[in-house]
């Protein structure tokens, strides 16, 4: 029989029904699934915050039937019986918004929307738009040839010029056209060349170089043509000429003469 001291010092046996401690990873996974289930429930409640009210209006009490829901995360939720109080919803009027008007740089009047403002960020109203000259749309090729601009001047120099993309009207299979605003292209050309006089001088120099290149090509073609003519004449001279005589003529004393029909050479001979 054990004494009282032995009973006090002996370790107590572990209860059989005490649950074992779960690893940290498992507990974290369980917690994530539980949070996911709660979020699904909150989202479902937020989707129907105001149940259908009674036809007579006013405050009503609605009781939802319990329902078993599988959250696909390891938990099955049972909807609790909830009471939703339905009342009249009062919407507060929104704040008064002031329109952001833009001032036209041509006439000085305010406007809300315009073609040039939307497509080219140019503060000009539709009434002041000069589509035939100042605000004319020109192609990228025309901008490069007329104002001596490069691709980097149009697309990479800050700020890059805005453009419109349209189908080529001449051929549907050709590439799309880039249309720039003439006013902005002129300003960019002045930024690149410094002044209108410098731009005109550069255009004259380029025109002179173009004329020189054309003259060189023309002289080269004339030289090749002369060489071809000389070679053909030289070939004709190297071939032997064969006379083609016409009918003979009786002169006198058994003397006869024949004349070449090609070169006019006369051959006189005597028949024995």
From Swiss-Prot:
SUPFAM superfamilies per the UniProt record, alphabetical: Glucocorticoid receptor-like (DNA-binding domain), Putative DNA-binding domain
Cited Pfam families: XPA_C, XPA_N
Expression triggers: Exhibits a circadian pattern with zenith at around 5 pm and nadir at around 5 am in liver but not in testis, this oscillation is dependent on the circadian clock and on HERC2 regulation.
Subcellular location: Nucleus
Chief location category: nucleus
Domain of life from the UniProt record: Eukaryota
PTM sites of type N-acetylalanine: 2
InterPro entries according to UniProt: DNA-bd_dom_put_sf, XPA/RAD14, XPA_C, XPA_CS, XPA_sf, Znf_XPA_CS
Free-text disruption phenotype from the record: Deficient mice cannot repair UV-induced DNA damage and easily develop skin cancers by UV irradiation. They develop stronger longer-lasting acute inflammation, they show a more severe UV-induced damage of keratinocytes and Langerhans cells as well as the enhancement of local and systemic immunosuppression. PGE2 and COX2 expression is greatly increased after UVB irradiation, this causes the enhancement of inflammation and immunosuppression. Natural killer cell activity is also significantly decreased.
GO cellular component, one term: nucleus
Region called Interaction with CEP164 and required for UV resistance, residue ranges: 4-96
Gene Ontology MF terms: damaged DNA binding; protein domain specific binding; protein homodimerization activity; sequence-specific double-stranded DNA binding; zinc ion binding
Location of Phosphoserine modifications: 195
Motif (Nuclear localization signal): 28-49
Post-translational modification, as annotated: Ubiquitinated by HERC2 leading to degradation by the proteasome.
Residue numbers binding Zn(2+): 104, 107, 125, 128
Alphabetical keyword list: Acetylation, DNA damage, DNA repair, DNA-binding, Isopeptide bond, Metal-binding, Nucleus, Phosphoprotein, Ubl conjugation, Zinc, Zinc-finger
NCBIfam families on file: rad14
Miscellaneous field: Plays an essential role in the repair of cisplatin induced damage by nucleotide excision repair. Cisplatin is one of the most commnly used anticancer drugs.
Subunit structure: Interacts with GPN1. Interacts with RPA1 and RPA2; the interaction is direct and associates XPA with the RPA complex. Interacts (via N-terminus) with CEP164 upon UV irradiation. Interacts with HERC2.
UniProt record similarity statement: Belongs to the XPA family.
Protein name per Swiss-Prot or TrEMBL: DNA repair protein complementing XP-A cells homolog
């Amino acid at each position: 029989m054990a004494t009282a001291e032995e009973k006090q010092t002996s370790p107590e046996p572990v209860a059989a029904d005490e649950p074992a401690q779960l690893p940290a990873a498992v507990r974290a996974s369980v917690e994530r699934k539980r949070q996911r289930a709660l979020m699904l429930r909150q989202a479902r409640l937020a989707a129907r915050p105001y149940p259908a009210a009674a036809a007579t209006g006013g405050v009503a009490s609605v009781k939802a039937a319990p329902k078993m829901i599988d959250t696909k995360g390891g938990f099955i939720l049972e909807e609790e019986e909830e009471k939703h109080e339905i009342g009249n919803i009062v919407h507060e009027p929104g704040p008064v918004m002031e329109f952001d008007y833009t001032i036209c740089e041509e006439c000085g009047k305010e406007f809300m929307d315009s073609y040039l403002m939307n497509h080219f960020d140019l503060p000009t109203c539709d009434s002041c738009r000069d589509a035939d000259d100042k605000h004319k749309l020109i192609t990228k090729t025309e901008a490069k040839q007329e104002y001596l601009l490069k691709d980097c001047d149009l697309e990479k120099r800050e700020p890059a010029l805005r453009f419109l993309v349209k189908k080529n009207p001449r051929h549907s299979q050709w590439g799309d056209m880039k249309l720039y605003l003439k006013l902005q292209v002129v300003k960019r050309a002045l930024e690149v060349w410094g002044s209108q006089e410098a731009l005109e001088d550069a255009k004259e120099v380029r025109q002179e170089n173009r004329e020189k290149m054309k003259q060189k090509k023309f002289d080269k073609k004339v030289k090749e043509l002369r060489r071809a003519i000389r070679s053909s004449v030289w070939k004709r001279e190297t071939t032997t000429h064969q006379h083609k005589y016409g009918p003979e003529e009786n002169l006198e004393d058994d003397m006869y003469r024949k004349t070449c029909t090609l070169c006019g050479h006369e051959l006189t001979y005597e028949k024995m």
